[in-house]
Each structure stands twice: as C-alpha cells, then as structure tokens.
C-alpha cells in the first residue's frame, strides 16, 4: 500500500491540477438509470510535491472540483536526484505495476498516460518508465505515486547501514 507521509499545507504551494480521466457511471434503480461522473485529478507544484484525488458527483465540474480538493488533501513530498529519481524501483498497487528508472539529463519523461501526468506534476524531467499489469488509470497513477513516495536517499541508506554494522560488530 501507499506509505504514510507528513501533512503538507496546500495553501503554501502554487499547485497545478491535471485531469487524468473522467468516467461516466450509471446506477440502475427501480425507476430507471441514474447517471453520475467520477474524476481522477493529479495536483502538483513541479517542485517535489504531488497528490492524487478522486471525486464523484452528478455533474462533471463538481466531480473535478471534489477530486482536486481530495488531491490537495493527499499531498506527498517526493525525493529527487536533480531532475530524475534517485534509484530504480518497481511498485505495485492492485494489479498495476510501475517501473521507474533514473535517466540521463536530456532524456525527458519516457512514460504514457497517468504515469506521465504524475511525473510532470512532480517536476521530474528525466525518467524511464514501464507500466505492467492492469491498465486501470487510477491504479497505475497510485502505483506511480507509491513508487515515488517509496524512494529513499542512497547516501542516507548507506550511512544507516554502516552505523548498524558498527553496532553489530561492537556487540551493541
């Protein structure tokens, strides 16, 4: 599942919303069919902050505004290494699996659909991606966000491992 992160105040950031998809849904009731809409929105400031939100309503504009408000409530801070991700990672959400690989400067975002929208909102400029498993846009977007939040600083990991090895060697 997605990792727990600290709360980020959206009022301090200049956020831009991107609509990933709108889905028309129908509920069959005794009197006929009731139409509704579901929207998936990604919001980010292009400087390491990104969030995903889903909104449902009877009309499209209200579904989009609900999704945008939900995305602002679910903001995450992402660790970057310059314009790319610090290391390769494969993250799974439901049946959707997303591979994120660092790329050389000037490569661009090699991604499609909801993966591209999430990465552009984050501010990542160079990355290689592969989406595997299901093609459900919501699950692919959540897998991408999960992979980004699971990123760790390689230098911090090395120092943490070294300190734990020293403690083990000294018998502490």
From Swiss-Prot:
Record family assignment: Belongs to the universal ribosomal protein uS5 family.
NCBIfam families from the UniProt entry: rpsE_bact
PROSITE patterns reported for this sequence: S5_DSRBD
Domain of life: Bacteria
Keyword Ribosomal protein: yes
Protein name (database record): Small ribosomal subunit protein uS5
GO CC term (a single one): cytosolic small ribosomal subunit
UniProt-listed Gene3D superfamilies: 3.30.160.20, 3.30.230.10
HAMAP family in the record: Ribosomal_uS5_B
Keywords: Ribonucleoprotein, Ribosomal protein, RNA-binding, rRNA-binding
InterPro entries: Ribosomal_Su5_D2-typ_SF, Ribosomal_uS5, Ribosomal_uS5_bac-type, Ribosomal_uS5_C, Ribosomal_uS5_N, Ribsml_uS5_D2-typ_fold_subgr
Coiled-coil residue windows: none
Gene that specifies this protein: rpsE
Swiss-Prot/TrEMBL domain comment: The N-terminal domain interacts with the head of the 30S subunit; the C-terminal domain interacts with the body and contacts protein S4. The interaction surface between S4 and S5 is involved in control of translational fidelity.
Subunit structure: Part of the 30S ribosomal subunit. Contacts proteins S4 and S8.
Cystines in this chain: none
GO biological process, one term: translation
Job of this protein: With S4 and S12 plays an important role in translational accuracy.
An example molecular function term from Gene Ontology annotations: structural constituent of ribosome
UniProt keyword annotation of Protein transport present: no
Ranges where the S5 DRBM domain occurs: 15-78
């Amino acid at each position: 599942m997605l990792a727990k992160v600290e709360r980020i105040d959206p009022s301090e950031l200049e956020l831009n919303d991107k609509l990933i998809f709108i889905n028309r849904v129908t509920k069959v009731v005794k009197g006929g069919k009731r139409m509704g809409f579901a929207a998936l929105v990604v919001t980010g400031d292009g400087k390491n902050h990104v969030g995903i939100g889903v909104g449902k309503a009877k009309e499209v504009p209200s579904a989009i505004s609900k999704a945008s408000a939900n995305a602002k409530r679910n903001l995450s801070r992402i660790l970057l290494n310059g314009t790319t991700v610090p290391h390769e990672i494969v993250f799974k959400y439901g049946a959707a699996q997303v591979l994120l690989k660092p790329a050389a400067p000037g490569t661009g975002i090699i991604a499609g659909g909801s993966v591209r929208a999430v990465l552009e909102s984050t501010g990542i400029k160079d990355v290689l991606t592969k989406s595997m498993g299901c093609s459900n846009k919501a699950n692919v977007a959540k897998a991408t966000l999960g992979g980004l939040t699971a990123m760790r600083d390689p230098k911090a990991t090395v120092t943490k491992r070294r300190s734990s090895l020293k403690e083990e060697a000294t018998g502490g």
